[in-house]
Amino acid sequence: MGKNKLGFPLTYSKLYEYYDLLSTNQDEIDRKNRFIDKILSQYKVKTVLDFTCGTGAQLFGLKKLGYQVTGVDLSPFLLKIAREKSRQKKLEVELIEGDVRETQVGSFDATITIFNAIGHLTKTDFETSIRNVHKNLVNGGLYVFDIFNLNAMTDDAIKNLAMDVKVITGNTKIYHNQNSEINRENGRLTSYDCFTIEKEYDEPKVLKDEFTLQIYTAKELRKILVRNRFEVLGQYEINGSKLLEQETMNMLTVAKKS
C-alpha cells in the first residue's frame, strides 16, 4: 500500500473474486450514476477519468451513456475483474494499474473517485491526490467524489453501518460480519470484518481483518479543495438531494479546477 497507512478491505485483495457480491448494490450504483451523469451533462463533459475504478461500477455505466472513459485503480485484482467485464459487456475501455496520488494519464473533462475511495488515504495523501487530479484535468475540468460525512456519524449511524450478510455463489457460501467504531477527534472510521467461506467438501475458512477510512466534514472538504486550487461548485447527498451538513451520511462534492 506504500504511503497509505489506513488499509483496504480484504475484498480488494485476498477475496477480490467476491468483491461485487459483497460490496456492490446495483440499485445504489444506478442511482449514483444517474446523478453523476446529470452533473457531467450540465457541464458538457465528454471525457472522464475514473481514478478509483475498482471493478467498473461507474466506468461501464458512464460508458453506456456515451462518455469516453478511462479507468485507473491501485488493485490489480479488481482491474482483472474489470477487464473481464469489459470483454463480457463488449464495452472497450482503457484500464490502467495506477495510483491516484501520482499516476498521470492525460487531460480529462472530469475525474471521479466514488464509493468512499478517498477515505483510504491519509489527510496528507488526500491532498497529494487532489493535486494530481488537478494535473489530469483540462482547465475548468471537474472533480466529483463522495465520502462519509463526519458530522453525521452519530452513535446510531455507526450502529446502522453494521453488516451481517450471507451470499451464495455456485457451491460456495460466504458469511460477512462487519462492525465499526469512530474516533471523532481525528475523523477515522475503523471497520472490523469477519468472513467465513464455506466451500462444498472443504473445511470452513475464516478470515478476519480491519481497515480504516479517513472521513471529513463538508466544511473541511471545502477548505482542502480551495487550498489546492479547486473551486467548490456544490455538495449534495449521494442521490442528488440537498446536503444537510449535520445529517447527510454520504456526501458528494463537485469541484472545478481553477
Regions found by a protein language model. Name each.
Residues 1-54:
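Conserved class I S-adenosyl-L-methionine
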Residues 56-102:
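Class I SAM-dependent methyltransferase SAM/SAH-binding core
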Residues 101-110:
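A short acidic, Gly/Pro-enriched loop at the edge of an enzyme's catalytic core
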Residues 127-139:
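A short glycine-rich, Lys/Arg-flanked "PGG" loop and its adjoining helix->strand segment in the class I
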Residues 140-147:
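Conserved beta-strand signature within the Rossmann-like core of class I S-adenosyl-L-methionine
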Residues 147-219:
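SAM-dependent methyltransferase
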Residues 212-258:
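C-terminal lobe and adjacent flexible extensions of AdoMet/dcAdoMet transferase-like proteins
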